[in-house]
Amino acid sequence: MSLHASKRLKRWQLIALTFLLIAGIINFLDRASLSIANCTISKELGFSATQMGLLLSVFSFGYALCQLPIGMVMERFGVKKIYGFGLFLWSLAQTVTGLLSSFTHLIIARVILGIGEAPHLPTGVKVVNDWYNIRERGLPMGIVNMSSTLAQALAPPLLIALMLAFGWRTMFIIIGISGIILSILWFIFYRNREQLELTDDELNYLNDGAPPSSTNKVSFKEWASLFKQRSLWGMIIGFNGVGYMVWLYLTWLPAYLENSRGLSLEKTGWVAAIPFLFGALGMLVNGVVADYVVKRGADKMKSRKWMICLGLLFAAMFTLPAAYTDSTFSAVACISMALFSIHFAGTSAWGLILVSVPSRLITSVSGIQNFGGFIGGSFAPIITGIIIDQTHSFTLALVVCATVAFLASLVYFFFVNEPIKDPAEMEVKTV
């Protein structure tokens, strides 16, 4: 029995990771574009901080609501079709945003952007699950997650350069058209695992060490019964803390540096990139550490859980001093370490699914967990906008963010103690 990927599998692993890496970068450039143009758009169109907070939030509401059914839909129709359609839809919405001026129309475009991007992270989890052995999924999952934060690091200097050269509207259109082109390439080149005739050695490599799982499609009854499991609720509520902090910094960091720290637009682009580079590093480090400790004999589920809890705690600890320091250097350093820690935790949260959930439920549980994260992410921008309008400061907003992360670490610690069980197998045992 072979425990190594064949040359053909390695080729498909490379194709899959390359697509997800590029799509992840475009995905988060789309999300970051509004936060980068935050001050420019609010001045040009006359929007308040609360209105901008709402614009930044509605993306997450559309995204979060689609997370609940997206896993079941992807399991029924396949990753290739659903992700390809989502990539095309979100890129079209991004392109159209560059043509709009009405607050209402911008709200609608942002909601559609969120709906289109809904399959992205569940697709990453499913693709890694399909093409990698369970003992080797930490690093590829880290790379998939890293693409998003790498884009967040690229976004400030790249998007500000585009905005200064062509204006904010053309910036939106350029990024949107790039995504439309990638969606066409995805449809042409990507293949679902079921579309290939794998050899026995390839199947042995892919399935070795994985928990047994039924190959039947997930029914609505089985999907609904997942919510009876305590660990799933821990994942949903706990991931709120990850989503809240990620989205506070993603949506408001450029405005924070401009308004609270007095940086110019050009300088903001480069300084804002630093914390997101640390976030990308946190994802990559987590992937390496997760694979290392498992290969050294650590329990796959418990090790991920501890990394989540510690990551959330350190993220809270670094965010608090950023709220009170008078030094711009110290604030950026603390925020950088907070983003390193929160993305270290977030990557472990996705890795937790890969080692604690039966294969056929991977996309369903991924979507449900992501729903939790984006509920937190939905409220972070609007709550921050309201706090800024009321206090004319980011201090309270950062304190709230740190508190949410701390509480999320407690939820993971006390609630996530058992693997997710397959409802089909539970029914068989009770008969």
Language model regions located:
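C-terminal ends and interior cores of transmembrane alpha-helices
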Residues: 88-101, 310-326
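Helix-loop-helix hairpin linking two adjacent transmembrane segments in secondary transporters
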Residues: 144-195
